[in-house]
Amino acid sequence: MRPRITFRPLHGILLLDKPAGLSSNNALQAARRLLRAEKGGHTGSLDPLATGLLPLCFGEATKIAGLLLGSAKAYDAEIVLGVTTDTDDADGQPLRERSVPALSEAALQAALAPFIGRIQQQAPIYSALKQGGEPLYAKARRGEVIEAPVREVEVHAITLTSYASPRLRLRVTCGSGTYIRSLARDLGEVLGCGAHIAALRRVWVEPFRTPEMITLEALTALVESGADAAQLLLPVAAGLSDFAQITLDATLAARFRMGQRLRDPAFPEGQVAVFDADGSPAGLGLVDADGRLSPQRLFNGLNAAAAC
């Protein structure tokens, strides 16, 4: 019989290198058990096929998980031309095979160009987007006819890193909500041969541009060695580095923590991260054009290290 896990309050961000074949939620729960963290959340799903950076938020850090969900991201994608699948990736069932035309690098660059910028993109039918309160993938698995939603997404850059027919590799930098599977599918149609994702790796998520990731295997080994894996957590403040920052003295910080609005013409307008004078994160706020700071999310029980 397995010993019962005693969970504990733990605050911080773990930069997990998600393995292929595991859902984002299963990866989160595995890490949460290893850390013995009471509360955890992830910052946006990676497809089971995908590997790479999955920031996991624990404790008070879960209050900024939604902000990281909306951050810019970068992916390395391997695309196979000539075959379409029902999931738009290699995990799905083949639907159609077509011959791949002779393609020069210039032709590929020209085909990729319309996918850069703000574009309309139809989500895969096998996706976690909900329709009528139910994920699309659940409907697709039952064989229902689905019209996946078309949404505006932003692709900042696409770099063709290699091409050896029928495989090409891309580095894609994009905004929140972009499906690389959809990009591969649509590129295949532009080229007239169809395509699907063979491999996908997320390499960074703002603000973690050069992440030092840890695998579940390494995390397990660390725990089994008797070490406290909490040392791997980044402080909550690490997830706030892209925000304008306001530092308050003890009196004003106490008022802010009680939900009171503060006013100072010197406050930068927009969403801000608010810190105590000792460097501990107090919360997130919104400053209007008149310098009024309104609390949005308040952090509780964090010291200057903010990950303990």
UniProtKB/Swiss-Prot annotation:
**Group of enzyme by EC:** isomerase
Superkingdom assignment: Bacteria
* InterPro entries recorded: PsdUridine_synth_cat_dom_sf, PsdUridine_synth_N, PUA-like_sf, PUA_sf, tRNA_psdUridine_synth_TruB, tRNA_sdUridine_synth_fam1_C, TruB_C
The residue range of the signal peptide is: none
> What Gene Ontology molecular-function terms does this entry list?
pseudouridine synthase activity; RNA binding; tRNA pseudouridine(55) synthase activity
Is Magnesium a UniProt keyword of this protein?
no
> Where's the active site on this chain?
47 (nucleophile)
Sections of the chain in a coiled coil: none
Q: Record's Pfam families?
A: TruB-C_2 (PF09157), TruB_C_2 (PF16198), TruB_N (PF01509)
Instruction: Check the record and name the SUPFAM superfamilies matching this protein.
Output: Pseudouridine synthase, PUA domain-like
The reactions it catalyses are:
uridine(55) in tRNA = pseudouridine(55) in tRNA
Q: Does the keyword Repressor apply?
A: no
Q: Which UniProt keywords apply?
A: Isomerase, tRNA processing
The processes (GO biological process) annotated in the record are: mRNA pseudouridine synthesis; tRNA modification; tRNA pseudouridine synthesis
The record's EC number reads 5.4.99.25
Q: What does this protein do?
A: Responsible for synthesis of pseudouridine from uracil-55 in the psi GC loop of transfer RNAs.
Q: Which family does it belong to?
A: Belongs to the pseudouridine synthase TruB family. Type 1 subfamily.
Record protein name field: tRNA pseudouridine synthase B
